């Protein structure tokens, strides 16, 4: 018997006699297979800055990308910069967006920026611009159009001249943005062409491919072409209906996907765990993977798992994140990061001007995942009971095993590592217990390295096991 084998057997024998974290009659086994799947990248969403206060810029940036070791931050391409063709307004970027981006880089020099066109309805004032909107748009509603009217391609416009997209203007608009950021010393790693509304390209993929090819020819010499993100549809169902199954794409899916850096969708209709269309999510992911198993697949605006004033909701709604990872999504942009104390329950951090920021349980759960494994890989796992929803991520030797108890009673969760893998050092246990109404986890430790361990997970609660492994 080798010394290493003898040591492992000795450790296992010693630890077998240790008590589990509590005791329960109901035991569920989570088996970690060791099969490495897609790389995982996590980002925060700063596309909407309604509650990013300049006087709190340092504090909010540190919370967003300093404490959180995210890969990327989603930022806005602001239509207010050139609402009318040829008339630019630098304050659309210089007032808040550029200072925020530079402060982000201060706290995370390796942060990558993901630029996304912000809906144009935010550029117009419903009162002072009422006549202009009424003259140009049905019912005066610009909808979710992501580009200025002069670029064309808007489905709600009344005037025919704007109905067809001008591909060269579209490419120029995006290149101008990238060049402006470059002059400010800000490189953009990912560029989204859409933001839910797909009317710009009119179902003709040649429009999109033309723009992808045209942008690099318009960039300053010092500016690098970002990865293209497309189509960021309203829902995974739209990803099939309005992208993959569109006639101009359906017959040449492989060719089209090669030209796109990241295939993306939103899941806007999924308000919470009870309205989550998991089947639609899986169908879209499977369709992409069937064409290109290694294609980067992102949710560029993940809804449903939102920061609330109720930690128990944050805990249970986290199932939406775990299901995305299980479906094969490699990039998650959580929408939104900054928000108000009162109002839509989207934010990860509530940042009311007078009261200062307040973190949510979602923030703490996300931090637990991101800071241990962002940039790592998703690892296949299986649960012996559907009440326990597992997710396993690994970065180098660091592993995070997540187990969500969706049931109404406590469950003893036994985690089994694959053959030949064992724990080095202690297992850190982070528990978010719904009944405690606390955003922060209770932390305890398993003192001994073993190949499997058991822990009690209370009803409707979430546990993360953070550990270092050896093979």
Language model regions located:
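Bacterial N-terminal signal peptides
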Residues: 9-17
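C-terminal beta-strand-rich structural cap/linker in extracellular carbohydrate-active enzymes
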Residues: 446-471
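N-terminal module-boundary/linker segments of secreted carbohydrate-active enzymes
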Residues: 23-55
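Substrate-binding cleft and catalytic face of glycoside hydrolase catalytic domains
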Residues: 65-253
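Aromatic/acidic polysaccharide-binding cleft in carbohydrate-active enzymes
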Residues: 299-367, 371-373, 377-386
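Noncatalytic carbohydrate-binding groove/subsite architecture in carbohydrate-active enzymes
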Residues: 204-318, 327
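Structural recognition of the beta-strand scaffold that forms the well-ordered cores
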Residues: 40-46, 69-77, 112-116, 189-193, ...
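Carbohydrate-binding surface patches
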Residues: 383-422, 460, 464
């Amino acid at each position: 018997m080798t010394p290493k084998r003898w040591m492992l057997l000795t450790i296992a024998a010693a630890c077998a006699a240790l008590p589990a974290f509590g005791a329960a009659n109901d035991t569920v086994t989570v088996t970690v297979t060791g099969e490495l799947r897609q790389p995982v990248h996590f980002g925060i969403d700063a596309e909407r800055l309604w509650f990013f206060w300049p006087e709190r810029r340092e504090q909010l940036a540190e919370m967003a990308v300093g404490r959180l070791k995210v890969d990327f931050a989603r930022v806005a391409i602001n239509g207010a910069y050139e609402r009318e063709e040829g008339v630019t307004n630098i304050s659309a970027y210089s007032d808040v967006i550029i200072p925020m981006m530079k402060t982000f880089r201060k706290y995370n020099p390796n942060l990558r920026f993901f630029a996304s066109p912000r809906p144009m309805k935010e550029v117009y004032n419903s009162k002072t611009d009422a006549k202009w909107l009424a003259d140009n748009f049905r019912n005066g509603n610009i909808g979710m159009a992501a580009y200025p009217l002069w670029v064309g391609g808007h489905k709600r416009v009344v005037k025919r001249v704007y109905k067809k997209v001008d591909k060269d203007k579209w490419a120029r608009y995006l290149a101008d943005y990238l060049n402006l950021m470059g002059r400010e010393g800000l490189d953009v790693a990912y560029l989204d062409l859409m933001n839910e509304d797909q009317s710009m390209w009119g179902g003709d993929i040649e429009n999109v491919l033309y723009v992808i090819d045209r942008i690099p020819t318009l960039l300053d010499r010092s500016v690098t072409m970002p990865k293209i993100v497309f189509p960021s549809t309203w829902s995974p169902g739209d990803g099939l209906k309005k992208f993959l199954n569109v006639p101009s794409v359906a017959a040449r899916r492989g060719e089209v996907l090669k030209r796109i850096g990241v295939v993306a969708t939103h899941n806007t209709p999924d308000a919470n765990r009870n309205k989550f269309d998991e089947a639609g999510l899986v169908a879209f992911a499977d369709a992409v993977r069937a064409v290109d198993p290694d294609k980067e697949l992102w949710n560029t605006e993940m809804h449903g798992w939102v920061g609330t004033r109720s930690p128990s909701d944050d805990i249970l709604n986290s199932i939406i994140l775990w299901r995305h990872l299980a479906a094969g999504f490699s990039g998650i942009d959580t929408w939104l990061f900054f928000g108000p104390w009162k109002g839509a329950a989207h934010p990860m951090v509530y940042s009311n001007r007078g009261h200062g920021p307040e973190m949510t349980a979602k923030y703490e759960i996300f931090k637990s995942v991101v800071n241990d494994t962002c940039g790592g890989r998703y690892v296949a796992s299986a649960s012996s009971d559907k009440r326990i929803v597992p997710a396993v991520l690994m970065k180098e030797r660091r592993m995070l095993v997540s187990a969500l108890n969706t049931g109404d009673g406590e469950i003893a969760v036994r985690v089994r590592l694959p053959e030949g893998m064992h724990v080095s050092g202690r297992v850190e246990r982070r528990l978010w217990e719904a009944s405690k109404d606390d955003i922060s986890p209770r932390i305890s430790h398993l003192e001994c390295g073993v190949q499997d361990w058991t822990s009690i997970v209370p009803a409707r609660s979430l546990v993360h096991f953070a550990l270092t492994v050896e093979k």
